[in-house]
A protein has these predicted regions:
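Bacterial Sec-dependent N-terminal signal peptides
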Residues: 2-4
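Bacterial N-terminal signal peptides
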Residues: 7-17
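Intrinsically disordered, low-complexity terminal tails/loops enriched in metal-binding residues
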Residues: 15-121
């Protein structure tokens, strides 16, 4: 009897990762975890869009937020200031063309001033 319970418990534990929450891209970008929310990075025609999403997959209001994208472009580091653009998006213009999947870090500063970082590899 104990063996059956042990086997059943092991099967349940091994199945747990299947229930893990994986954030989904709603704007065609890449989504990573950053502090208490998810960050989606979208690069379009020299513009960086950063969408903030809560753990319920709902867009977050970005009023009072600011950000900085530090991206590696053509082997050089480029800093792009991000400002609110719409209700749930921060946006900034790059100095030139961007790859569709830029690599780097996005730093988000909420109104409380506690900076969080999202790494995009």
């Amino acid at each position: 009897m104990k063996l059956k319970v042990l086997i059943a418990a092991a099967v349940l534990v091994l199945a747990m990762p299947a229930f893990a929450h994986a954030p989904k891209s709603k704007h065609g970008g890449r989504v990573v975890m950053a502090g208490a929310f998810h960050v989606e990075l979208v690069a379009k025609d020299g513009t960086i869009e950063v969408h903030l999403i809560d753990h319920s997959d709902k867009p977050m209001t970005v009023s009072g937020y600011k950000g900085l994208a530090i991206l590696a472009i053509d082997g050089k580091s480029q800093r792009i200031v991000l400002e609110p653009a719409g209700e749930a998006q921060l946006s900034g213009k790059a100095a030139g063309a961007l790859p569709s999947r830029p690599k780097g870090v996005v730093q988000i500063t909420p109104p409380d001033g506690k900076v969080v970082s999202a790494r995009f590899d």
